[in-house]
UniProtKB/Swiss-Prot annotation:
Recorded superkingdom: Eukaryota
Organism: Homo sapiens
Gene Ontology molecular-function annotations: GTPase activator activity
Chain's gene name: GRTP1
InterPro entries xrefs: Rab-GAP-TBC_dom (IPR000195), Rab-GAP_TBC_sf (IPR035969), Rab_GAP_TBC_domain (IPR050302)
Record's GO cellular component terms: cytoplasm; plasma membrane
Record lineage: Eukaryota, Metazoa, Chordata, Craniata, Vertebrata
Name listed for the protein in its UniProt record: Growth hormone-regulated TBC protein 1
């Protein structure tokens, strides 16, 4: 592509992230020209839906969310569907009380250590930017550490809180959305033992064995632990793994439908690239394949990708997930 053509795609995306040097401008332009039409159509429908003031839980809303929440409505919709808005309304002033509470040097140091590692490719998080979102990120993570002392701060939460801040542009709303994720939607993912995270990685393994037996057999033959391949997918909720717009579309559904969405995404990535994965002959090889499957046009074209996650894995109810979690958790606890 000629330099003049390259400049048609801004080097910084709408969220403040610098596009990498190897960014495929041509593929992105082709995708976005059609996606823009979809976005415009969805924005009109959402504006109509929200005229009444509320965001009722209904089949219509579920369908709308799966087709994507427009950026201008995203914070409001996430807040309502996740229960974060209700929590914030019931606890006025609580967030600011947490920030003014007793100091915890260990917590503060742990958070500070990760600030510069959080989105170095995002201009909004650079110290040279005014205002710099690092301070906002620090406040949200500090308040959450005081609020949920059983978790405190865990690596991965910085990336999640960072995305929440970019979408809400509001500290307090970001705090309550983080609480919805860490406290309710993904319980025990970020606790010291990370039992919820370990359990869900095992659940994914069981789902792969049932739905994609050839991949399951390869994993067993090579003796690969799922944690080696997907721990960052789960703990970062695909942040810094999949393209920004795709992650946000996943989160639209995550806040509305819960954690089974993570399994749908993981299963779709694996199923779509099953042939590539089955070429692996060693542990390093399969690790490399799992990095490859999170790149390219399949994940960039977020609208098609989201349609796939609701068709490719087949039926996947919360009841099925709950049953698998129960057996996997029991197995992990028995192993000590």
């Amino acid at each position: 592509m000629q330099p003049a053509e390259r400049s048609r795609v801004p080097r910084i995306d709408p969220y403040g992230f610098e596009r990498p040097e190897d960014f495929d401008d041509a593929a992105y332009e082709k995708f976005f020209s059609s996606y823009l039409v979809t976005l415009t159509r969805r924005a009109i429908k959402w504006s109509r839906l929200l005229q009444g003031g509320g965001v009722p839980r209904s089949r219509t809303v579920k369908r709308y969310v799966r087709k994507g929440v427009p950026l201008e409505h995203r914070a409001r919709v996430w807040m309502v569907l996740s229960g974060a808005q209700a929590q914030m309304d019931q606890n006025p002033g609580y967030y600011h009380q947490l920030l003014q509470g007793e100091r915890n040097p260990r917590l503060e140091d742990a958070i500070r250590t990760d600030l510069n590692r959080t989105f170095p490719d995002n201009v909004k998080f650079r110290k040279t930017t005014d205002p710099c979102l690092q301070r906002t990120l620090y406040n949200v993570l500090l308040a959450y550490g005081h609020h949920n002392q059983g978790v405190g701060y865990c690596q991965g939460m910085n990336f999640i809180a960072g995305y929440l801040i970019l979408i809400t542009n509001n500290e307090e709303e970001s705090f309550w959305l983080l609480d919805a994720l860490v406290g309710r939607i993904l319980p025990d993912y970020y606790s010291p033992a990370m039992l919820g995270l370990k359990t869900d990685q095992e659940v994914l393994g069981e789902l792969v064995r049932a739905k994609l037996p050839a991949v399951g057999a390869l994993m067993e033959r090579l003796g690969v632990l799922w944690t080696l391949l997907v721990s960052r997918w789960f703990i970062c909720l695909f942040v810094d793994i999949l393209p920004v717009e795709t992650v946000l579309r996943i989160w639209d559904c995550l806040f509305n439908e819960g954690s089974k969405i993570i399994f749908r995404v993981a299963l779709t990535l694996i199923k779509q690239h099953q042939e590539l994965i089955l070429e692996a002959t060693s542990v390093p090889d399969i690790c490399d394949k799992f990095k490859q499957i999170t790149k390219g046009s399949f994940v960039m074209e977020c609208h098609t990708f989201m349609q796939k996650i609701f068709s490719e894995p087949g039926s996947l109810s919360m009841a099925t997930v709950a049953k698998l979690r129960e057996s996997c958790r029991a197995r992990l606890l028995a192993q000590g």
